Amino acid sequence: DGIRDKLVTGVQTCALPIYAVAGKVYVNLQDLNRFAVIDTATDAVEAEIALPGCRTNHGMALDAKGRRAFIACEGNNVLVVLDLEKRQIIAQFETGRGSDFVEYDAGLRRIYVPCGDGTMTIVQQDDADHYRPLETFPVSRGVHTVAVDPTTHRVYVAEQSVDGRPAARISVYEAVTP
């Protein structure tokens, strides 16, 4: 309760990135290589979904309209696409090493995965069930976060170092549009 500054309820999980959409909360159970779905009406875990082929699921983005979760697997450098209705992985792509964060541009239907090895992988969503790798290109080493402006489709990448020296810089990339 934000007005009373009081915890109303809690759900026991050990989790990273959490997204709430349409009465559900989606959670990466990183240490278990699983994905949880929590029902907000009951505050109970509705499902735990195994993520075969994904180790140390960390970053996550959602396509709420298409009912897909895009999950970066830090332990084996892949991105998996999870069908939230069927509760199964429908696609998998290699990424650079150290994939951490994921961002989804719903307008261009692109998934961005910055990686600590100094690369960013981009996957194109042709429709909810079909995906293809667009490219992996160089960015600064150690990048972890990315944001996409849904209007301009510019991609913002936070950099921790430049030319091997500590820095706090945001690089801006223009998305190539069809």
Predicted features along the sequence, with ranges:
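A short beta-strand motif characteristic of beta-propeller blades
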Residues: 11, 44-50, 88-93, 132-137
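Short loop/turn segments immediately following the C-termini of beta-strands
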Residues: 30, 74, 116, 160-162
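Structural motif
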Residues: 34-36, 78-80, 119-123, 164-174
